[in-house]
């Protein structure tokens, strides 16, 4: 097994920074897959919109039959990689989950993946600035006796690439889906103080404006967030990262 060259890592990082489309990102993912001596890759990021709704963004070259079955059977509910990535940051080798299932009646996603050619693999959890999470996974169609060594070498290089990958992937897709729904600084301020339990009158005194102005900004924020009341606006703004603690910074 050939060790990963540091120059390859640096080259891929620079190539990712030059990406202008998801097709470009796919090519970089393919290069990364070859670099770690695997066949398949999957970049998946789950973006929450509410406590019950989310969007899933995926770039991959997984076998189509497996992807179709995975979606049709709603295996995301039982996928230990998804569950692990939601609450962890460290890379994980799939063989840890091979004999585990949520319960005896639940499907063992790792074992079922093997029947579709994803025999061995490992994943790197991803966490985004807007409360999204996901994973970057690599897989092989054969039982590789060196999988632990492949995993170890990948752990020394892939984490160096992931920040650039996630940042540029986000920029590309924000540019492709640009809208006029970004909250203004004043709308964020009003929502933030509403988070602290302040009334419109309280907020008006804190911000030095009229109560009517505060109501105006909160109503605009509600329209942009597609919510029906102040409480829902607050929870959705926090959940989706529309507002966060450092918003006071200029």
Swiss-Prot record:
UniProt keywords, alphabetically: Activator, DNA-binding, Luminescence, Quorum sensing, Transcription, Transcription regulation
GO biological-process terms attached to the record: bioluminescence; positive regulation of bioluminescence; positive regulation of DNA-templated transcription; quorum sensing; symbiont-mediated disruption of host cellular anatomical structure
A GO MF term: DNA binding
UniProt keyword Cytoplasm, yes or no: no
SMART domains linked to this entry: HTH_LUXR
Pfam families listed in its UniProt record: Autoind_bind (PF03472), GerE (PF00196)
DNA-binding region: 200-219
Domain HTH luxR-type: 176-241
TM stretches of this protein: none
This protein's record includes keyword Transcription: yes
InterPro entries in alphabetical order: Sig_transdc_resp-reg_C-effctor, TF_LuxR_autoind-bd_dom, TF_LuxR_autoind-bd_dom_sf, Tscrpt_reg_LuxR_C, WH-like_DNA-bd_sf
Gene3D superfamilies: Transcription factor LuxR-like, autoinducer-binding domain, Winged helix-like DNA-binding domain superfamily/Winged helix DNA-binding domain
Family: Belongs to the autoinducer-regulated transcriptional regulatory protein family.
Role summary: Transcriptional activator of the bioluminescence operon. Binds to the OHHL autoinducer.
Protein name, UniProt field: Transcriptional activator protein LuxR
Organism: Aliivibrio fischeri (Vibrio fischeri)
